[in-house]
Amino acid sequence: MSSEQSHRLRKYNNLPVWVVEDHHDVLPFIYRAIGSKHLPVSNISFIHFDSHPDLLIPVNMPADTVFDKESLFSELSIENWIMPVVYAGHFSQVIWIHPCWAQQIKEGRHCFLVGKDKSTTTIRVTSTDDYFLSDGLYVPEEQLESPKSLHLDVILLEPIREQDWEYKEKGETVAKKIKLEESDQVVEGSSSGIQSSTSESSEDGLMKPTYLNASTKTSNETCTLDSNSNLAKNIIQILEKGTVYVLDIDLDFFSVKNPFKEMYTQDEYKILQELYSFKRPSVHSLEEELVDCVENRVHQLEDLEAAFADFCEDDSDETVQRWASNPGMNSLVQLVHSLKSRMEAPDYEMIHQAGLTCDYAELPHHVSTETEIEGLLQSVKNLLTCLPKPTLVTLARSSLDDYCPSEQVDYIQEKVLDVLRSLYGSLDVHLEFSPGSSSA
């Protein structure tokens, strides 16, 4: 977006902060800001702090649903609400900033297309990352209609060392360090380039930067302010000059649980991992091999979905044995037997949803200590200090589904709001969730 276009946008008197429970519920407020001309219709940057990428796609949703926003909102859920906005043409750049325990997508820059699959009319992507392949979302470029380009940057943020929490009172801030160093480094105002020490070729032949980010470790396995400074400079270079962006924070960025691990026994969870395991293609797979990989994966998931849907109606031994006779599904017998021994009526739909998270990597699970939460808060604060002010902020609590621990969510929410107030002054906070939605 040009500087002239950004100047034509309306400005909020105070920075709006929308706080919701389920993450996809932030979307109506982003669309409202587009409608009121506080955000542009296209080329919005989206900075996303989260333990989960949320970059999947509703598998069977017609692509044209994105052009009816009310229908769109009703189709989305917590893991798949960002990509439809990309296909609608609003987001062109997503920066996923994640903690060290979340490793679902490879680090670096991913440039790919998001469009309508000509054969199914659903939304699909050209990315060959395991995250998309394992959900059956890849198609070749020539199979897409109305493709939109997406620049996805995946960046690791580590907590700041405890002894540096009061660094601001003792010496230079990160922001000051960057300003002092700007004379020594040319900062390109382009969304396509990050100056870094090394780069590597991606599977699609594009050069991916190796980020000088906060994953640079110290002896205490936490980041220093110098590495945080490098990370901030990288993000500043990613954002085009004059670009407006939405700042999005899921509170499970600071502390996260895998709720399915508490629903099922260790043996049951292991069986789900076996049933839903994803066979990765080789690193240098040809397009035909990738297409075959996705087709096989889609058939695998469809068979499992059909099996558990059948169990909702009839989970007798005969039905289970019939499904277990299919290749790769023999462990269904042991799984259903174990579930029925513990539960009067197993929720087979929920079991399938749990299985879908057991493909190539487990859901992140790290219940943070107060010290770890504070270290991440300090790191987020130092990073945001260096960035332009966002147009609006969205916060997701993610506590009712137990991704952010319910006993910590209120504490984390207040701490995050305190950070935002310290950076941006008065806030226009909207609490869009039911009171008492956590146990804290």
Curated annotation (Swiss-Prot):
Lineage top rank: taxon: Eukaryota
The protein's matches in InterPro entries, at most eight in alphabetical order, are given as: UPF0489
Q: Which organism is it from?
A: Xenopus tropicalis (Western clawed frog)
Describe the family membership recorded for this protein in Swiss-Prot or TrEMBL: Belongs to the UPF0489 family.
Q: Which residue ranges are recorded for the region named Disordered?
A: 187-207
In Swiss-Prot or TrEMBL terms, this protein is called: UPF0489 protein C5orf22 homolog
Family matches, as PANTHER family = MISEXPRESSION SUPPRESSOR OF RAS 6, UPF0489 PROTEIN C5ORF22
Low complexity compositional bias: what residue ranges? 188-200
